[in-house]
Amino acid sequence: MSLDEKMILLATCFLFLPYQIASVGIACILVQAFCRHKLVDAIKNQTGAIFLYGFIGLEFIVTILYSNWNGFGNTWLFVLIGFYGAYYRKSITKNTFEKMCDLIIILSIFAAIYGLYQFNQISIANGRSFLEFHIFNSPKRRITSTFMNANIYAMVIDFVCVMCMYRFVKNDNILCKIGYVIVALFNFFVLYLTGSRTALLPFALIFPIFLYCVRWKKLFLTSIVLELCVCGLVFLKPTLIPRMSDMSTFASRIKIWKTAFICISMYPLFGWGPQTYKKFYPLVHGHKAPHAHNIYIDSILSYGVIGTILVLCYTFVLNKEIFTSNTRKENPALFGMMMCFIAIVLIYGLLDCTLNIVATGTLCFIILNSACMYKEK
């Protein structure tokens, strides 16, 4: 295993640490790559680089012009993820990719154990016992593991569950297959305890999508029937979903979106850069929030029409690589995992913005860039 491959695995470990440590750790890996003359060429050959770094450059200019210093800092995160994505593309191999997925699955176990510890502490502090499994509505009283908040951790779990499906297909060892199922179920249990309702929505699609991509037709049809049964059960008994009776957060989102549209109407072309909502809402006495809680609205709000077009151009180029590479033919399970990641982001994005953090942003970015392993040379 080369040094670059070892650095990829080290960076993977950093993703499960608090975001401050993760950011510094990945930055150090990029510095060593630059010193070894590995980074510049990687960026030059990065798919869609002109759109990605054109967008980042635009956001630096916009955030400075509007003194949006939170957004300025957030833009440096885009640089970090973009540069690491370039280094990843240059360094990743098929064998290292499988090891990386297994490492993520193993690390998720420790994150989940810590999440259970948090849940126990929160329960005791609020006069409850662990076995009551009472999930509070307050974000401060919900488990986050090593991540910023419950919803970000929940998205990480969504990604991990998809990886468990991927490795279940790729690994022929029966004991390993059983292990992946156990880890996925354990993570799903902890996901339930996060109280993130949004994170449960993708499960209505990711199983059929993945099974269709790996061409398991009978299981694909079975999964659709089971999904419909689960949806019917939830319809008949909504209390199965945690915090389902609390609609205050959805009412808050309506207020947030109304405030966001006011800002969009005033600054439609460029916005104010990342986290525009956080800077704008006090000016119109809007509902307090760090972002617009919808990636579609937040994209137009923060980046404007011009910035959003650049993001869409990059997304188009990256998806073109995914669909024109040999990924679907040579590794349908990886193609299925990519489609599931896209589905998770699109569904999750209806009610939240959870990609603007190093763990979720980097993890999603590198998986969607993994088709580079199957490009025709």
Model-identified regions with their sequence ranges:
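Transmembrane alpha-helical segments and their membrane-water interfaces
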Residues: 33-40, 59-115, 160-163, 347
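Transmembrane alpha-helices of multi-pass inner-membrane enzymes
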Residues: 27-34, 162, 335-377
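Hydrophobic transmembrane alpha-helices and their immediate junctions
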Residues: 35-39, 174-179, 204-212, 220-223, ...
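Long extracytoplasmic/lumenal interhelical loops at the membrane interface
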Residues: 240, 247-258, 262-266, 270-303
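Alpha-helical transmembrane segments of multi-pass inner-membrane proteins
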Residues: 98-131, 135-138, 145-214, 235, ...
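N-terminal signal-anchor transmembrane segment
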Residues: 1-38, 55-66, 345
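A membrane-periplasm/extracellular boundary helix in multi-pass inner-membrane enzymes
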Residues: 113-122, 194, 211-250, 258-266, ...
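Membrane-interfacial loop-to-transmembrane alpha-helix junctions, especially the N-terminal start
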Residues: 2-7, 40-54, 97-101, 176-180, ...
